[in-house]
Every structure is written in C-alpha cells, then in structure tokens.
A protein has these predicted regions:
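"Short basic amphipathic alpha-helical interaction patches in structured regions
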Residues: 81-89, 129-131, 146-151
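Short beta-strand and beta-hairpin "edge-sheet" elements
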Residues: 97-144
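Polar/acidic, low-complexity leader/linker segments enriched in S/T/G and N/D
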Residues: 1-46
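Long, hydrophobic/aromatic-enriched structural stretches that serve as scaffold segments
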Residues: 63-112
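Intrinsically disordered, low-complexity segments enriched in serine, threonine, and glycine
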Residues: 148-304
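Oligomerization/assembly interface segments of phage tail-like spikes and tubes
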Residues: 47, 52-79, 126-140, 279
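Short polybasic amphipathic segments
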Residues: 3-15, 20, 97-100, 223-227, ...
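A general secondary-structure signal for short beta-strands and their flanking turns/coil
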Residues: 62-66, 95, 107, 125-129, ...
Length: 304
C-alpha cells in the first residue's frame, strides 16, 4: 500500500489534501494502493514460435496498472455530505478518463480510466469515506507538465555564416550526400533548447519517454529525415507539407495525423523514443525551409 504523507493529490479537476473548503466540505485522499507498483510484462505465446528479426520486447508489452484510490470528506451537515457524494460521483464517473497527479518530492502523474462506480463504505454523518478503482492503460508515471522545444529547419551553409566562434555549435559544414546535409556540432551548450535543425531534450525520469512530434511546413516529402542521435533511430516521411499544414506524430500510439486524416502509412523507419538522460534529435533537410518548424513535446517518465 502506498503511503500518501499528506501530499496534495489532484484527480481530474478535484484537489485533495490542500486544506481548502469547498461548499462546507474538506476533501482528503489517503489511499493510492498500487501507486508504487512497476509495470509487468504481458506474455504473448505463439505455437509457431518467432521469426528472425522479431524483437522480444514486441512480444512482451506492458500490462495495464490497476489502482485503488480513496479517502474521506469532512462535512458540516448531512445535507452538505449528500452534495459532496453527488460531486464525487459526477467527477469520478465510470469510464471517464482522468489524470491523477501527486505533488510529492518528485511530482508525478498518471492517466487513468475509472473502472468502478465510486463507493462510500463508511458514513458517520459529519464525515464519510470514498473509494474508486481505476486502470492506467500506460502504466508509467509522467511529469505533471511536458517539455516543449521548437527548432527551425535550414540546409544551406549561408545561414550558419552568421554565427561566430562564440557560438560554436555549427562551425563545420559537411556535405555527406546529395540529399541530406549535416553539421558537426558541440551540443553541450544546448542541453535544454532548440537550435536550427536540432532539439536537445532531457528525460529526467528512469523509463523511456515517447514524444509528440509536430511538424509545420513547408516540407517536401522525403527531403528530410528525423534522427535521434542518442538512440540511433531514424524516421522519414513521404508526404508533402504545405505552409499551412501541420503533421502530428504520436510515437507512443504510433499514429500520424495531418489535420483529421490518419497518414501513418507514409512513415518509414523508426518511431523515436527518448531514453533516460540527454537526447539529441536532429532534422536533416535537403531544401531550405526557414518557415518550417519542428516541435518536440515530451514528459519525463518513471517506472514507478
């Protein structure tokens, strides 16, 4: 059983343990059973065995995580108590999707789906207990707020001539192929930001994070490549983006949307992830696109 230590807990838009009085009621959360559990693998067995090249991890996806969440509410009257129960039943409705955030020494959050009706196992008039069961499809904890870093995209050397020796990230130009131009760089000075063609982002957790990648045109299909230099992953995309087009790639769900249209079948290569620690993502482009942008949005991710 996870001990709460009176940490402030937010479930959806309801706050617990923060000392505020809402309509004559004080809301407490003292039970987060399962919060400290780590993700377990779901074993998939095939009677035909596995073919060459199949990654073992693909056959052992992570199980969902179940939690029991509960606490108590102090009320000024039985009438206020009934109103508080109605409020909890409304906000903790069955099959609703909520985010649970615990403000501890390291604030963490988890997205859950309510899988039972809220229960009130004990009621003494001036206070009552509440209990609800939830399921987290993605069993890892994330930071309450994401990191979002944007970089612009250039290919030609003329842009980098504006940099002096005081900014040595792009001093040496290397034309390694007729399609993709790359640059040698000192990225130590860009550990938390976005530079032309490059995003340096840190995952401060201890589990792999899966970012949302947003690309804004104009970009010519197959004229660019997204590379995570820290993991060796590479992704190309065979679709033109106009100046008003925005492509959103979800690397966890492995989906890509151009507006409301699913276009993940244009993706070739790897769906990149962010390993714990520093990650360097670089866009290699063959055509100058000063109006094009890439934004990487990611949460720090923990195993527990």
């Amino acid at each position: 059983m996870s001990h709460i230590f009176r940490d402030v807990v937010t479930i959806g838009s309801l706050s617990f343990n923060d000392g505020t009085i809402v309509n004559g009621s004080t809301y407490r959360c003292d039970l987060l059973d399962g919060w400290d559990d780590t993700a377990e693998p779901r074993v998939e067995i095939s009677e035909f065995g596995y073919s060459d090249g199949v990654r073992t991890s693909d056959r052992f996806p992570k199980k969902e995580l179940y939690l029991e969440v509960g606490g108590y509410v102090k009320v000024s009257s039985r009438l206020v108590g009934e109103q508080a129960k109605d409020l909890l039943a409304t906000y903790l409705d069955v099959n609703s999707t909520l985010r649970i955030t615990r403000q501890g020494p390291i604030p963490k959050a988890i997205d859950v789906r309510v899988c039972s009706a809220v229960e009130f196992p004990q009621d003494v008039g001036e206070a009552f207990r509440w209990l609800v069961r939830v399921m987290a499809p993605w069993p890892y904890k994330i930071s309450p707020s994401p990191k979002a870093i944007t970089a612009v995209m250039f290919s030609g050397i003329d842009y980098y001539r504006t940099y002096t020796d005081s900014a040595p990230y792009y001093r040496t130009y290397v034309n390694t192929s007729p399609y993709y131009r790359t640059y040698t760089s000192d990225t130590s000075v860009s550990s938390t930001g976005g530079l032309p063609n490059l995003v340096a982002i840190t995952n401060d957790g201890n589990a792999d994070a899966y970012p949302i990648i947003q690309l804004t045109g104009p970009l010519v299909g197959r004229s660019w490549e997204l590379v995570n230099e820290s993991t060796g992953e590479s992704m190309t995309f065979g679709l033109d983006l106009g100046s008003t087009d925005t492509l959103i790639i979800d690397t966890l769900q492995k989906t890509a949307y151009l507006g409301s249209q699913a276009v993940e079948y244009y993706v070739e290569g790897d769906w990149p992830h962010l390993q714990p620690g520093a990650n360097i993502l670089r866009v290699l482009v063959g055509v100058d696109n000063p109006d094009a942008r890439i934004t990487i949005t990611s949460y720090d991710t923990w195993k527990r």
